[in-house]
Amino acid sequence: GNNDWAYYLLSQIFVIITFYFVWKFSNLVFEDKIFSLLSVLLLSGIYFYNFTTPEFNVNVSQLPFWALSVYFFWQGLHSNKKFYWILFGVVSAFGFLSKYLFIYLLLALLIFFILNIKKYSKFIKNYSFSILVSLIILIPHFIWLFENNFVTIFYGLNRSGVSDFNFINHIKNPIIFLSKQIVILIPFFIMIFVIIRKFKMRINVKDKKILFLLSVNLIPILLMLITSILTGAKIRTMWMTPFYLFLGTLFLLIFKNYIDLKKMKIFYRIFLFFFILSPMTYLGISLIDKTKRTDYPGKEISRLVQNKWDDNFSNEIKIVIGDEWYAGNLS
């Protein structure tokens, strides 16, 4: 329609907010604007943050809340100010409302907190309060969920194929899941490779920053893998959209002493390549492939059905029954 541009703009606004808070968080970690900028630029090498961003959907909508949750949680751990913990509770609730898979990040943060409970014993009260804030915000949704027979949960389960039990799925789907993640991250690793002088990985297990970033980046993916193994669920690629937001920060922190800033020209060339390739590819596919959902003639079909109805009936169409796509377009 004529207002489709608004959805594309909204998507980019969400992405910009996300990148801004990734940069803000990275600045707290590195206290160096160059490394903070690199943390964001590296994301251009990940499929989810370039090619798929024009389409505004639940995967894009949860991006800023994912970044904000990590940022405010870290600020809460750093200062223990109730203000940051309240904000964490608010944005994490909105993130969960964007998509239930947001729970994987919240579980990762909880696991990190529990594993370091002795160090953060003074933070328990404020962290618990942030959880209470989230639950209060989520109460109306939980009531709606109960009254509507958990329809959104069953929708997700059906999309993952959990209801179709097959033992081989417990092996096949996790392998497919891991394989796809490796392929998706290849451009990211290329960008990292060109600026690293030596591949010496030294992880200080006592470094709070590294432990936190390992938790934020790896635990959600590990939990997703475990879910696929235990349930045989087919993890759809787009479900992983927010999971890699802080991967650049993690790798830069691990290899910080071996980053060669003299190679930045090569890095910028690769960055520009992926930065330009993404919109050009998206534009090309949009012009060539007319079977995408964005090209679905919903208004024309709706108008045709309405005209047929008016020719045969005098009353209005009050209810349209069908799946969310066809019935949604028709209504």
Please state what every model-predicted region is.
Residues 9-30, 68-72:
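Transmembrane-helix motifs of polytopic, lipid-linked glycan transferases
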Residues 28-30, 69-84, 255:
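Membrane-interface transmembrane helices that cradle and orient dolichyl/undecaprenyl
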Residues 39, 84-100, 110-111, 133-136:
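Membrane-interface alpha helices of multi-pass inner-membrane proteins
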Residues 51-61:
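Short acidic/glycine- and proline-prone juxtamembrane loop motifs at membrane-interface regions
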Residues 94, 105-210, 220, 225-226, ...:
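Transmembrane-lumen/periplasm boundary regions of multi-pass, lipid-linked membrane glycan transferases
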Residues 103, 295, 299-331:
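Short periplasmic/luminal acceptor-recognition loop of GT-C membrane glycosyltransferases, typified by
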Residues 257-287:
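Signature aromatic-anchored transmembrane alpha helix within multi-pass, membrane-resident enzymes
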